[in-house]
């Protein structure tokens, strides 16, 4: 079973352009998601203690996929952004929670993945920051 860590605290540093999501849960190795726009890409750094995964998906693709997400009962993630080797699997829950699974695939024998959950308030901040326009709006 997957263990999703909630990211319910967010900080937008307008000086550096860094958007940070973290957990309010007091734990020694709290997960953290840092994002920064870099031209046509978004640099993501996902860390959990000393382990970090860095991805650079195209911002237009991320914006488009987030705008088309709908909750599908029984499925955790329904879309992916990136390539077959490095991607973010995304899923929207019926309560507005966004599931994110940044993944690095080694080959057919394994992968490294972070299971993150953005609360509805955190998701709203992300959507505004990326510039998401929902298809149903």
Language-model regions, residue ranges each:
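Positively charged, low-complexity terminal tracts
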Residues: 1-137
């Amino acid at each position: 079973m997957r263990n999703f860590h909630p990211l319910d605290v967010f900080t937008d540093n307008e000086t550096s352009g860094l958007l940070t999501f973290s957990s309010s849960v007091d734990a020694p190795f709290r997960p953290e998601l840092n994002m920064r726009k870099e031209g046509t890409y978004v640099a993501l750094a996902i860390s959990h203690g000393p382990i970090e995964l860095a991805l650079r998906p195209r911002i237009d693709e991320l914006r488009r996929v987030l705008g088309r997400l709908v909750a599908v009962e029984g499925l955790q993630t329904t879309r992916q952004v990136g390539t077959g080797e490095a991607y973010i699997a995304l899923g929207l829950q019926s309560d507005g929670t966004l599931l994110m699974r940044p993944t690095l695939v080694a080959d057919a024998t394994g992968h490294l993945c972070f299971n993150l959950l953005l609360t509805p308030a955190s998701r709203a901040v992300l959507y505004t920051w990326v510039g998401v326009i929902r298809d149903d709006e």
